[in-house]
UniProtKB/Swiss-Prot annotation:
Residues annotated as binding (2R)-2-phosphoglycerate: Q167, K343, R372, S373, K394
Catalytic activity: (2R)-2-phosphoglycerate = phosphoenolpyruvate + H2O
Keywords: Acetylation, Cytoplasm, Glycolysis, Hydroxylation, Lyase, Magnesium, Metal-binding, Secreted
Enzyme class: lyase
Gene Ontology annotations of biological process type: glycolytic process
Mutagenesis / variant outcome for changing K343T: Decreased enolase activity. Strongly reduced enolase activity
Cofactor note: Binds a second Mg(2+) ion via substrate during catalysis.
Record protein name field: Enolase
UniProt-annotated binding residues for Mg(2+): D246, E291, D318
Gene: eno
Localization: Cytoplasm; Secreted; Cell surface
N6-acetyllysine, modified sites: K326
Pathway: Carbohydrate degradation; glycolysis; pyruvate from D-glyceraldehyde 3-phosphate: step 4/5
Length: 433
């Protein structure tokens, strides 16, 4: 009953108004899975390739008809008659057929959309929720947890049209007893932050990930505004709520000078100086997690940063590791960072994503399931976070349906699983248990 009878791809629109790939996988018995590939703005140079058409007469060159053709042509032909329950085989067929290291023939956007749609179809055929099927694929049947959200309530960098260099300023409602209560706390703080910003005469328009995107005098000013909002909402920073940042430092790294240039503050730092700049912010604002605190190729700098901060806070590799087990293994061997951000379109298939999560956990690293800045209503990452018991999720702010869709799916899953999926709060963050 799980034999593939049809694979269909189409071009749809993501949350930035750009095209992306959506795929359907149809099985015997009428079971169907549908999924869409997300898209990043600040991307690691070693990510799997997102195939775009380059035809300037359509979508300013960002069309994905070539990727869709790959789904409807060679991928569909190769998968017809295959068993959808054998996810590893489905992904291997597509990867082998593509034949490139970075999936540049078909595009990671094509392969991933089919990979996820296949998992959804297989779950339907098994008569179970997607998170349960993912738990089976992960070899951890029935081992669930609800993830601690990282809520990006001030957007900067490549995600916003403002003068703030650091890309994401996030809250983590660590004191909540449940995921649903964590969402409530995040929502309250989000609305109080709007009041704080308006009182300062600042803009409350939102960026790509649903957080506010005001012009600010410094990165510290963003943290100070959030601290004020946390307290206005009746919560205690460091007890009820902790802070996290995604620097996306590759975006303000000067390749010629080797320095980090915070243009919003008019400051320039060497690699070690920037680590100490971050160290001061962590002390002042009780930050427990920093992502991509240096340029993705600054491995010596990351080794130093891990030495200085790695036993105190979570140091997350995103552009650094790009959900790639080869790169992650090198990082683990060299003692670089202590956590990995998991974005399945960086690697391009569900099987490879699960392998990266397993490698991280086996090495004592945390794994944070993440959206991309270009999203759709597809909420697969919610099921992925629960089904792998990853422990943390990063899926934007408390506005924009492309972000809220994931929180709403998590609320539904928590309701269904109850005590089978505990919410562990701060214990999930590396160095904070």
């Amino acid at each position: 009953m799980s034999k593939i009878v049809k694979v269909l791809g189409r071009e749809i629109i993501d949350s930035r108004g750009n095209p992306t790939v959506e795929a359907e996988v149809h099985l015997e018995g009428g079971f169907v899975g549908m999924a869409a590939a997300p898209s990043g703005a600040s991307t690691g140079s070693r990510e799997a390739l997102e195939l775009r058409d380059g035809d300037k007469s359509r979508f300013l060159g960002k069309g994905v008809l070539k990727a869709v053709e790959a789904v409807n042509g060679p991928i569909a032909k190769a998968l017809l008659g295959q068993d959808a329950k054998d996810q590893a085989n489905i992904d291997k067929i597509m990867i082998d057929l593509d034949g490139t290291e970075n999936k540049s023939n078909f595009g990671a956007n094509a392969i991933l959309a089919v990979s996820l749609a296949n998992a959804k179809a297989a779950a339907a055929a098994k008569g179970m929720p997607l998170y349960e099927h993912i738990s089976d694929l992960n070899g951890t049947h029935g081992q669930y947890s609800m993830p601690l959200p990282m809520m990006n309530i001030i957007n900067g960098g490549e995600h916003a049209d403002n003068n703030v260099d650091i890309q994401e300023f996030m809250i983590q409602p660590v004191g909540a007893p449940t995921l649903k209560e964590a969402v409530r706390m995040g929502s309250e703080i989000f609305h109080h932050l709007a009041k704080v910003l308006k009182a300062k005469g600042m803009n409350t328009a939102v960026g790509d990930e649903g957080g506010y995107a005001p012009n600010l005098e410094s990165n510290a000013a963003a943290l100070a505004a959030i601290k004020e909002a946390v307290e206005a909402a009746g919560y205690v920073l460091g007890k009820d709520v902790t802070l996290a940042m995604d620097c996306a430092a590759s975006e303000f790294y000067n390749n010629e000078t080797g320095n980090y240039e915070l243009k919003g503050e008019g400051k320039t730092f060497t690699s070690q100086e920037f680590t100490h700049y971050l160290e001061e912010l962590t002390k002042q604002y009780l930050i427990v997690s920093i992502e991509d605190g240096l340029n993705e190729s600054d491995w010596d700098g990351f080794a130093y940063q891990t030495k200085v901060l790695g036993d105190k806070i979570q140091l997350v590799g995103d552009d650094l590791f790009v959900t790639n087990t080869k790169i992650l293994k090198e990082g683990i061997d060299k003692g670089i960072a202590n956590s990995i951000l998991i974005k399945f379109n960086q690697i391009g298939s569900l099987t490879e994503t699960l392998a990266a999560i397993k490698m991280a956990k086996d090495a004592g690293y945390t794994a944070i399931i993440s959206h991309r800045s270009g999203e759709t209503e597809d909420a697969t990452i919610a099921d992925l976070a629960v089904g792998t018991a990853a422990g943390q999720i990063k899926t934007g702010s408390m506005s924009r349906s492309d972000r809220v869709a994931k929180y709403n799916q998590l609320i539904r899953i928590e309701e269904a699983l109850g005590s089978k999926a505990p919410f562990n709060g701060l214990k999930e963050v590396k160095g904070q248990a």
